[in-house]
Amino acid sequence: MSTFSSIFGSSGDNANVDKSIDSLFKASKGPVSRQYSDRARTVINIPADAATEESGADQSESIEETEEDKERDIKAEAKRAKKTRQKKDLNEDLESKYYNKLLKEQDEEAPKVEKDEKVESGSGSDSDSDDEEDQSGETKSKRAKTVDLKENELEKAERTVFVGNVNASVVGSKPMYKKFKKLFSQYGKIQSIRFRSISFDDAVPRKVAFAKKKLHSSRDTLNAYVVFAEKEPSLKCVPKLNATEFEHAHLRVDHVAHPAPKDNKRTIFVGNLDFEEKEETLWRYFNSKTDNDVESVRVIRDAKTNVGKGFALVQFKDTLSVNKSLLLNDKPMSAEKKRKLRISKAKAHTKPSILSPNHIDNSKKAYASNKSKMSAKLSDQQRTKLGRAQTVLNKSDRATAGKSRNIIEGQRASKGDSIAGIKGLKSNRDRKIKKPRIRDRSTKFKNERDSMASELKNGPKK
């Protein structure tokens, strides 16, 4: 037997044949007939016009679809760019809006608390309806602004006394400073003393010159501001200390918030003075001629250089002294000084022409146009405080009084904003560009350097 028959068995062995499979093969119908194999294939004939129309429609539909896709893409890109731009704009002012919202919530807390207390007495349904009305009545949030009315400075001015013609030795030595402070402390507790109108000898920064105590030799007086702890002592000391001598100099004492009235009938104008004339010489000269009747002497000086402008105002206690002093017109003060004084009665300021911008009517119009928007939002009490600040306070405080303060702690400042504490920071329009200082030494160095460079290139000159 072969290996094949040993594994699978012989073909004649009917015992190993499966009957179900054998029955399937017995029931077969034989081979496929010839007529089914030779039958022609069915083909559908499409007319030429219909085919071209369908192909054209397909092409037009595809073109329209591509154009629509392009338009859709362009619109989507535009929307995307707009969204990014809006997000940028929102994010730039996000921090300031947050802080402004906090300020607004703090301002609205007080009236809301009072309203809630009133609503508690009513029914619950009423409170729900009120809440709905509050939500519906909300307006767009505005930028929080606080108007600077200089209330702290005004309160400080009520306790401040101006002292003129003070001996400059008060700044130089501590014993003199203590003596000056003791003169005013007998009327009440002193909070602080500020010295102004100091003339220095060297052209260095004022803080450095003050630390070195290098004062100008020809200007031996200065002004001071004495701040008391309370208001009453400041009012008491003015009439008692005015025209008193301190270290051989007559003091001119006046209150900052409540100055003494200026009476033109008791005042004279003194002209043709030396630019370096001192107040003390005028005090002594007119006191000797009017039996110590001088109330105050004021030499008009330049704000920057602190040098006199050549004229002064002298106020007396009595009008009879004015007539006595008028007899001294066209006469020198002493034999050493040959300048003849020009003495006349003090007059009120003459009104400028109606065509001048300094006329009262024109200045009122300009002031009203600038301040109308701001003053419309202020109450009567706030306007009173603002007007008081502009008449009483100094030059720097007057410039900032009434302006809105937008920059607060934690808020981002924009370019060009003036910020308190940063000296010399102005807007881009007013900011000056610093130019380098050109000196003879630097120009000589540059010329020598250029000549050496040219010699190296071209050789020495023959």
Swiss-Prot record:
Q: Which gene encodes it?
A: NOP12
Q: Which PROSITE patterns match?
A: RRM (PS50102)
* UniProt function note: Involved in pre-25S rRNA processing.
Provide a GO biological process annotation: maturation of LSU-rRNA from tricistronic rRNA transcript (SSU-rRNA, 5.8S rRNA, LSU-rRNA)
* Composition bias, Basic and acidic residues: 69-79, 87-120, 137-147, 439-452
Q: Known SUPFAM superfamilies for this protein?
A: RNA-binding domain, RBD
Q: Which GO terms describe its cellular component?
A: nucleolus; preribosome
User: Domain named RRM: which ranges?
Assistant: 159-258, 266-348
Identification of the protein by name: Nucleolar protein 12
Q: Where is this region: Disordered?
A: 27-147, 331-462
Pfam entry (one): RRM_1
- Organism equals Debaryomyces hansenii (strain ATCC 36239 / CBS 767 / BCRC 21394 / JCM 1990 / NBRC 0083 / IGC 2968) (Yeast)
Acidic residues: which segments have biased composition? 51-68, 127-136
